[in-house]
């Protein structure tokens, strides 16, 4: 009879999950014993990087990725990254070793309350009742992670379970998509067909459901302006399309003003709505009807206004497109192109983003963790292909550096660029070592404004004055740090050096880091 370990690896092969992201400890060694030659183990030097790489890999493959962490301390180190995966709705199977069942009652060293620790930010958290249940629980975790709304699932596995005997699992498959109610889709189509001035808001659920281009067809049929929802972790509409109007602001008053004048607003794969600072105002103007489609029932339930339907966003979009008649409506005017920023030293963030955009490959995937520079990034860099833009939907830091490495390992032929702030880059800097070790040729561009400028902007917005400590970050040699972890790079301080340096980073054929020193301007939030 096979061991639990052998049965589990057979299961993972069948699921196509042969890459394991991990940082091993004593409670994980029994799982890694006799590691199969057809599997790949990707080592991260800290668990936040492990989980971030796994999330990027899952976003690249479209399937749940497997991460293996070291009991309670390792899971604790990874919880910030788990929160990001939860908000991004990225499917992950996260496992951790638990102490040996045979003396758990004595609470030996490394015994942990793992199931409870993971629970707030996973779709499910399990520990098998019996050793022979381990393969079935991992299969359950995989299908739970993949079922909409997708997300991370945690399994705690006692270290002595792996050598126990287990019966082979019976054949079992799950269809993970759930269609929205067809009557609701017909009703929505009728309302949209009669609308005088409809608008569309797209969110990450559009991209997750593979409907990036389908959303374009729907918007064109409606001749409706399209906005990206606030703080979206994925781009969901081609941003060079004439119907695209930009990103909605994450504040009630300003968002409602942006959507004013539209009698119907169709929100696809996004909350209604995601805000950040409290700015009182209506959700939308009183005359505006909101139609909401999301794969997440909680997202639909907490919406403040409108009519919601739960189901696969891509299926809903295709259903609406088929039902809607063509309209004779003048499309809205396209956005004005941004002004070309001036070349100067110190460089402005606008100039840096404009220069990156001028040489960025059309099929590049960009991982953005710029915080204070995000508005300028969206002004100059447009994403018109699926999988082109990734950021954290949780608002925390530390995802994009390891996320870009994991994505590159999943999609090795696609150019990957990580644009990251100086403060952000230090949260999961260990990912640079993994990039070098596994040949993930990501171009890392560190925007160095020598501080937490986004917090300075928030400080100014709330009138906190100038005596707020902890907002300056100086004295870090980012190129030196990268070289110490095996990644070459260079410092860029002069505007004339920027373009050739970016070209070198993009064409290096290996991971490469640019530290770009910019004017430490403080952004004006919600201006």
Provide a role label for each language-model segment.
Residues 4, 132, 168-170, 287-370, ...:
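Phosphate/pyrophosphate-binding active-site segments
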Residues 1-324, 359-362, 441-444, 461-464, ...:
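N-terminal alpha/beta PP-like core and its mobile active-site loop of ThDP/TPP-dependent enzymes
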Residues 24-25, 96, 159, 230, ...:
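Short, small-residue-rich loop/turn micro-motifs
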Residues 3-18, 23-26, 31-33, 333-411:
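Active-site diphosphate/adenylate-binding microenvironment
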Residues 121, 336, 485-486:
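Bateman (tandem CBS) regulatory domains
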Residues 203-208, 340-341, 421-423:
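Conserved short loop/turn motifs at secondary-structure junctions
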Residues 58, 145, 219, 357, ...:
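N-terminal cationic-hydrophobic initiation segments that often serve targeting/anchoring roles
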Residues 95, 104-110, 250, 256, ...:
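Thiamine diphosphate
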């Amino acid at each position: 009879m096979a061991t639990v370990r052998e049965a589990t690896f057979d299961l993972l092969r069948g699921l196509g999950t042969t890459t394991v992201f991990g940082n091993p400890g004593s409670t994980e060694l029994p799982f890694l014993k006799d590691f199969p030659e057809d599997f790949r183990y990707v080592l991260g030097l800290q668990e936040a990087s492990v989980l971030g790489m796994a999330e990027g890999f899952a976003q690249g493959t479209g399937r749940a990725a497997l991460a293996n962490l070291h009991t309670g301390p390792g899971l604790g180190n990874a919880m910030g990254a788990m929160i990001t995966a939860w908000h991004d709705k990225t499917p992950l199977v996260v496992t951790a070793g638990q102490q040996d069942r045979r003396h758990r009652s004595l609470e030996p060293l490394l015994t942990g309350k793992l199931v409870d620790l993971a629970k707030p930010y996973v779709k499910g958290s399990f520990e098998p009742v019996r050793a022979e249940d381990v393969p079935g629980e991992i299969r359950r975790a995989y299908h739970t992670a993949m079922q909409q709304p997708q997300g991370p699932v945690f399994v705690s596995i006692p270290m002595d379970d792996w050598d126990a005997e287990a019966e082979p699992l019976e054949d079992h498959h799950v269809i993970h998509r759930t269609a929205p109610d067809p009557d609701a889709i017909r009703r929505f189509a009728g309302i949209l067909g009669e609308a005088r001035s409809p608008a569309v808001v797209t969110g990450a659920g559009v991209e997750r459901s593979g409907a990036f281009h389908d959303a374009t067809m729907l918007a064109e049929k409606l001749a409706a302006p399209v906005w990206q929802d606030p703080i979206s972790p994925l781009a969901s509409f081609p941003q060079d399309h004439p119907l695209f109007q930009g990103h909605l602001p994450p504040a009630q008053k300003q968002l409602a003003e942006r959507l004013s004048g539209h009698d119907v607003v169709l929100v696809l794969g996004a909350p209604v709505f995601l805000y950040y600072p409290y700015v009182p105002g209506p959700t939308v103007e009183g005359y505006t009807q909101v139609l909401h489609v999301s794969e997440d029932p909680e997202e639909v339930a907490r919406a403040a206004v409108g009519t919601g339907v739960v189901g696969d966003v891509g299926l809903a979009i295709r259903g609406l497109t088929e039902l809607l008649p063509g309209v004779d409506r003048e499309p809205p005017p396209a956005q004005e192109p941004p002004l070309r920023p001036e070349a100067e030293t110190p460089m402005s963030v606008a100039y840096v983003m404009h220069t990156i955009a001028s040489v960025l490959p059309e099929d590049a995937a960009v991982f953005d963790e710029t915080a204070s520079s995000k508005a300028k990034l969206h002004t100059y860099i447009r994403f018109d292909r699926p999988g082109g833009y990734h950021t954290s939907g949780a608002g925390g830091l530390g995802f994009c550096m390891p996320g870009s490495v994991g994505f590159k390992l999943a999609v090795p032929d696609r150019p990957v660029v990580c644009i990251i702030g100086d403060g952000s880059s230090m949260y999961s800097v260990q990912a640079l070592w993994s990039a070098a070790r596994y040949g993930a040729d990501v171009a890392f561009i560190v925007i160095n404004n020598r501080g937490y400028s986004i917090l300075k902007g928030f400080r100014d917005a709330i009138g906190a004055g100038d005596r707020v400590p902890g907002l300056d970050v100086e004295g870090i040699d980012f190129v030196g740090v990268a070289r110490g972890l095996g990644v070459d790079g260079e410092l860029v301080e002069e505007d004339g050096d920027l373009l050739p340096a970016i070209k070198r980073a993009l064409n290096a054929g290996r991971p490469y880091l640019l530290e770009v020193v910019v004017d430490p301007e403080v952004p004006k939030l919600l201006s």
